[in-house]
A protein has these predicted regions:
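Acidic/His metal-coordination segments adjacent to aromatic residues that form catalytic metal sites
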Residues: 214-217
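Catalytic alpha-helical scaffold of carbohydrate-active enzymes acting on polysaccharides/glycoconjugates
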Residues: 1-162, 168-207, 219-237, 251-293
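Active-site clefts of carbohydrate-active enzymes
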Residues: 208-210, 238-248
Length: 293
């Protein structure tokens, strides 16, 4: 069940999916190239607008690979072969990239950034291949979440108890597992997840605080952002770390174009003198719980 409560504050949060240590030497720079790669656009925004707050959704053991061309995929299906692709030998497991984790920790220590959990593998063995938790049982969800946390702990990467489901794949077992493991917030898209939660409001969902996404980092229009703030209490600026991943085009990655779009939004907000609180998702969730007491 979802329960909305109009918060006294209006918030702005920037949130980025699919962050993991993969570099441009593989399929795409997914954050692994650090300040030399796509992260430079986020760092430029933080330098220009030091009040902004960012939630990075990190996958601790990314094994997902893009789909094959349709014909090859169909042939694999007909032959009864595994038709989803994955990385072997877990090359992007966080505890294999301690230097990268420490670099992210430094961003966390500065106060603008938090790290939340974005699945364990970001992969499943059937379509849709990125919807990792789709249809999983409670026990399977508990196991994956605990394994994800274990990798975060061994890597030393600091994280908060927040979760966004990879590929928007969810199940009742997932929500019960998140509740029982004392997660603070979840971030769901009501349309993609087919779940009845508000798109423009922070709300309570299954004893978790849901913080939606509602404005595209690259394609969002400025007037649309102001309409969202009129309708609700949060402008949640959503993007991916990568613009495309092999054949999979995401079209809202960290690029020069998305940097310019968000910069234009932030300048307009300053010019209008809007009374917004820039906050990380954990801060928003804690505020919401405090106001409900």
């Amino acid at each position: 069940m979802s329960r909305s409560g109009r918060s006294k504050s209006k918030y702005l949060n920037i949130n980025i999916d699919d962050v993991h240590p993969e570099t441009g030497n593989y399929i795409a720079d997914c954050g692994g190239d650090m300040e030399r790669g796509v992260f430079k656009y986020l760092l430029k925004l933080i330098e220009e607008f030091p009040k902004i707050k960012v939630t990075l959704f990190v996958t601790p053991n990314w094994i997902d690979k893009p789909n094959d061309p349709i014909l090859i995929k169909l042939i694999k299906k007909v032959l009864g072969l595994k038709y989803t692709n994955e990385w072997k030998d877990e090359p992007f497991r966080l505890d294999k990239h301690i230097e990268w984790c420490e670099w992210l920790n430094e961003l966390v220590r500065r106060g603008n950034v938090e790290v939340a959990i974005h699945g364990l593998y970001h992969h499943r063995n059937s379509d849709p291949h990125s919807a990792e938790f789709l249809g999983l049982s409670y026990e399977e969800c508990i196991t994956r979440l605990l394994n994800a946390e274990r990798i975060f702990e061994t890597s030393g990467l600091k994280y908060v108890r927040g979760f966004r489901p990879p590929g928007w794949g969810v199940s009742e077992g997932l929500f019960k597992a998140l509740k029982d493991l004392n997660y603070v917030f979840v971030s769901l898209d009501p349309l993609a997840c087919e779940i009845n939660v508000p798109r423009y409001e922070v709300s309570e969902f299954n004893s978790l605080i849901n913080i939606p996404q509602n404005w595209d980092i690259k394609n969002g229009k400025i007037e649309e952002a102001f309409e969202i703030l009129k309708k609700g209490n949060i402008l949640s600026v959503k993007g991916h770390i990568q613009e495309r991943y092999g054949r999979d085009k995401l079209n809202n990655g960290l690029t020069e174009e998305s940097y310019k779009n968000v910069r234009k939004l932030l300048i307009r907000i300053e010019d209008e003198g809007l009374d917004l609180r820039f906050a990380k998702m954990e801060e928003i969730a804690n505020d919401f719980r405090g106001e409900k007491r």
